[in-house]
Amino acid sequence: MIVSDDVVFEAKQISKLFPGVKALDGVDLTLRAGRLTTLLGENGAGKSTLMKILAGVQPPDEGELLVQGEPVHFTSPRDAQDHGIAMIHQELSLVPDLTVAENIFLGREPLRFETLIDYTELNRQANEWLKRLELDVSPTTPVRRLRVGQQQLVEIARALAGNVRILIMDEPTSAITERETEVLFRCIADLKKQGVAIVYITHRLEELEQIADDIVVMRDGCLIGTAEFGELSHDAMVRMMVGRDVKILSKQSSSNNQPVLRAEGISLSHPTRPGDYLVHEVDMHVCKGEVLGIFGLMGAGRTELLECLFGLHPTASTGQVSMHDRSVRLRNPADAISHGLALVPEDRKQDGLVLSMSVGENASLASLKHAERFGFIDRGREREHTRRFVERFRVKTPSLREKIINLSGGNQQKVILAKWLATGPAVLMLDEPTRGIDIHAKNEIYSLINELTADGLAVIMVSSELPEVMAVSDRILVMCEGRATQSFDRSEATEENILQAALPRRNSIPC
C-alpha cells in the first residue's frame, strides 16, 4: 500500500500554445496517493487541456511530467495507460456501435487461445462493473441506444475497470442523477482507500465537501492557488476562479398568461417494449415571456417530451399540439421550426454542433434561408446575419471563422443559442443548457434567458439541477416514468415537494 502522503505524479511548468491563445502558462500540479485533488476554474481556464496532457491525449509544448519521480514522455493515451493513468472525459469518447461491454474493455478484452475475444467472460466482467455502478442495462446493449447519463456511467466503468493508479475525472456528474452521483462517490472513496490518486474537475462546488482533499484553482491558463479543502470558503473559491464576486442570477417572474404553445395527451411509445411508453399522456402549456422548467430523474421522459414537440418521433408519438391557439402538425424538425419552435439539445457536441465547421457556419445552420440569394448562399449575408447574434450573446471567439471545436463549452453553448435564436422562434426549448459549463458561463446563460423572456419569448427548460430549475422558472412541471406528476407555481415550489413529485407515482396532471 502506498502511503497517502507519497507523491505519485508531478507536472512542472507545463505550457501549451494553440493558434491565437496560450492555453497553459507554466502550470505546476502535484498528485498524492489516496487523495482527491479538485481542479477548479472557468471554462477556458485550461483545466481540460492540462488533463489531456496528463492523459497522453496532447503533448505539452514546454514542461516536464514525472510518474513516481521518473520523467515520462507520453506520445499517446496508451502510453499514459501503461503508467496507470486513466481519464473519464466530459465529452463522451465511447464507440456508439459497440456494446456496453465492448466499450468498457476496449483494447483490453479477455481472450481465448490468445487470439479470440472471450465474449462470455467479457460480458460477465462488464456486468460486475454495471452492478457496482447500479446501472440497469445489459452489457450487450449497443451504446448508441443509451441516454447521455447512462453513457456517462459506462465511461466511468471503463476507466475504473482498468488497473489505475491515477484517475482523471472531467465533470463526471454533469449528466447523471443524484442517486448515481452517490454511487460514484462511494466508488471514489473505495479508490482512495486503495491508494489511487484522483484529479476531479467540477463546477458543482457543493460536491467538494463529500470528496475533496486538495483544491487547485486555475484561471486563463495559469495556476492561481492551491489549498487543502476547508481552508477556502465557497465565495473565496469563486473569487479565485473568476477574479471577482459572482452573484447567481434568478428569473424575474412573468405575469403573462397568454399561452404560446399547448400540448395535450403527448405520448411516445417505447421502441422495444410494446405497450410501454417513454412519455405517456402529458398535458402542458407555456406562455409568452415565461420559463416553464421541467424536472425529473433520469428516465423520466423529459428529453423525449421535447423531442416529440420538435417533430423527432412523428410515427411513434401521439397527441395534439397548438401554437397561438391553432392546431399544428409536427412531422419533422422542419415543421417545428416553421411553426416557431427551436430545440437546444442535451448533447451539444453530438447533436448541436458540426465540430469541423466554423463558429459562423454553425451559427447560421438553422437559418440559411436568410442568406439565400438566387438559390445560392451569399456568404456576406450569412456573416452579417450571424454576427448580430454572436455579438448579442457575447461569444468569445477570435473571429467567425474560428473552428467551433476550439471554443470553451460555455461559448459553444452560446453559439447553439445564437443558431436557434437566428430562426426567430416563439418557443425556445433548452435541454440541460448549463451542463458542463462554469458558474460564470451559467450566469451568462441565465441572463440571456431573462433578456429573451423579457422580449416575449417562451422558454421550456429541462434541467437536472434542482436549484437551477427553482431559480430560473416561473412554473415547474415534474415528470416521473414518462408521466407528469405535479405542477408548481414559482411561489409554492420547494425542494421537498418537487423531489417528492419526482418519485414514482401514477397520476397525470395538466400543466
Swiss-Prot record:
Pfam families hit by this protein: ABC_tran
CDD domains for this protein: ABC_Carb_Monos_I (cd03216), ABC_Carb_Monos_II (cd03215)
Protein name: Ribose import ATP-binding protein RbsA
Catalytic reaction list: D-ribose(out) + ATP + H2O = D-ribose(in) + ADP + phosphate + H(+)
Keyword Manganese recorded: no
Protein's organism: Rhodopirellula baltica (strain DSM 10527 / NCIMB 13988 / SH1)
EC number: 7.5.2.7
Keywords: ATP-binding, Cell inner membrane, Cell membrane, Membrane, Nucleotide-binding, Repeat, Sugar transport, Translocase, Transport
Domain ABC transporter: 9-245, 261-506
Function, in words: Part of the ABC transporter complex RbsABC involved in ribose import. Responsible for energy coupling to the transport system.
